[in-house]
Amino acid sequence: MVVNAYAGLTRPTGYDNMFNWVFGGVYGGDANKGSESNDQSVLNSVETYAVTATNDYLLNKWKDAYYGAQRCNLALNVMKEAADMDETTTANWTAELKFLRALFMFEGVKIFGPTGMPYIDETIAAEENDPKVHNGTDIYPNILADVEAAIEGLPEKQTEVARPTKTAAKALKAKILMQQGDMAAAKPILADIIANGLSPKGERLALQDDLDANFNATTENGKESIFEVQFSVGA
């Protein structure tokens, strides 16, 4: 179930994925939808800053945050009942899942705000996951608590490159702090990553000699990479 939680990082449609082409590139003015006016016409409202609550791009972005987080919650609860897991494996997987849950919820917060989404963790029973649950509470502290647990529990280098590392968790914390506008708190974390961070393969982080290497399948997980996951075709 831990591996299953990673499925939340990829979605079957392109408009709600984590690379945020819609809510980052198009909304930010760096990209245009193109094509014909009746092709994904709801994207026009995003591009013209006229999004309403009926826009299904928003609905899917909302669902994706909880789709991913719930997979983490299910895995965490199953692990609590597992009798044949050693402490090291349990600690590592728990840290992985909390990293992923923080990432999923942060993706939602970037769109809906820190008081626009209820924080649902593994302690909340399924019958309590009602869409009417109070969502007026700032969930940044919850997200940051997950990130801190990930920083504490993740290793510097994983045995499998797609799993998050301590460097990845630190980078996520810095991104969250910057999203909150706390550049002063993020700066020393980023400086530490630059000086001591490791790539998924355990290399010292550094800029690639050729920028294209970051987007080339033959050089994936390179020295400029902090966290990336490869999926099978159709996954």
What are these regions (language model features)?
Residues 56-57, 124, 156-157, 228-235:
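A broadly tuned preference for mixed-charge, low-complexity surface segments
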Residues 101, 106-108, 121-123, 209, ...:
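Glycine-rich, histidine-containing beta strand-loop boundary motifs that form or position
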Residues 109-111, 116, 158, 179-182:
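Short coil/turn linking the two alpha-helices of tandem helical-hairpin repeats
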Residues 114-136:
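Short coil/linker segments at helix-helix boundaries
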